Each structure stands twice: as C-alpha cells, then as structure tokens.
Amino acid sequence: MDFSTYDAPGALRDGTPIRIRAIRPEDGEALREGFAHLSEQTIYHRFFQSKRELTEREVEYLTHLDFEHHVGLAAVISNPAGELLIGVGRGVRLGGGRPGVRGAERDRTPAHAEVAFVVGDEFQGQGVGSQLLAHLAGIARALGIRYLDAEVLPGNRQMIDVFAHSGLPVTEQLRDGLVHVEMRLEEVAR
C-alpha cells in the first residue's frame, strides 16, 4: 500500500471533525506556522531543548518522507481558508531491529520504529495524539514493524498517558533521565 496518500477521518473529543493524513512536501509552511504557535513547554517536551524556529534542513527532513522508513502524519481541521494543522506524528524505522544491534543478530531482531508527536497547545487533551498514534501503529504493522519506541521527558505525563492508554502492551523504563517507552504491535490488549 502507498501510505504517501494516507487519509482517514477522525474527531476531537468535542466532536469537531479532523483528518489524519500523510505529511506532504508542501506542508513545510504549515509546519513552520504551527511551530511558531507552540508554547515553550510544548517545544521542550518534543525536542528536549528550547528552539525558536525550525531550520530549513529540519523542514526538509520533516516533509520529504519515503513512507517506508520514515512516515509522517498530520492531524488537520478543514476550514474555509484550507487546512489548520493541529498535530503531527511520525515514525522512523530503526534499521532492521533494535538500535546498536549489528550484523546477523540485527536481521533476527524484530523491527522497531521510533515515534514522536507534537500537538498544538489549544488542541492538547482532545485525543489528537491518541489518534495519530493509532494510525501510525496501523501503518507500522503493515510495514512489518513490531515495536514502536519513544523517548519522553518524565514531566511529559500527557504523552506518557497517551502511550499507556493506547491499548498496546507498553513497557516503560527510566534511562539517562528519559522515559523509554516500548509498545508491542503484534498483539493488542482488549
């Protein structure tokens, strides 16, 4: 399946319709604009540092995706002027398996992808991150990925809660000052 044309309906908790769609190269300006409206705390939670803007190189990386090794989804609200980007989720395949595993052993390990999310401040707590995660998990399964990994600051309870309530088997481990989250995709808790 060609995930570069991915598009699915969703809704905020208040019922406002949204779309979860593939990020496209022409989304660069919307990413810049959305970033400019993020609070310092949201930026720090996503990037683990303060930053004022996205560089050209970052925008290129975030919008030119192959949808096999690097998948990006945008949550958008349609309005008369076009679309309002309210959140982004992405997954990047980590080689053939766990980071740091080499050679034949790497080929025998399950495929992992690292995921990251950012949701505009006024839309946090509205289910956007959960929907982005659910759609990324579905795409990852179709691509043969068996685990989603994330690194989260311990103070980012909202994101940790999104993972914990995803319906996926989740393990958390505090390592080097970050919460390492691993979500197993081959089975879903019911």
Regions found by a protein language model. Give the residues of each.
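Long, contiguous binding/interaction regions
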Residues: 1-190
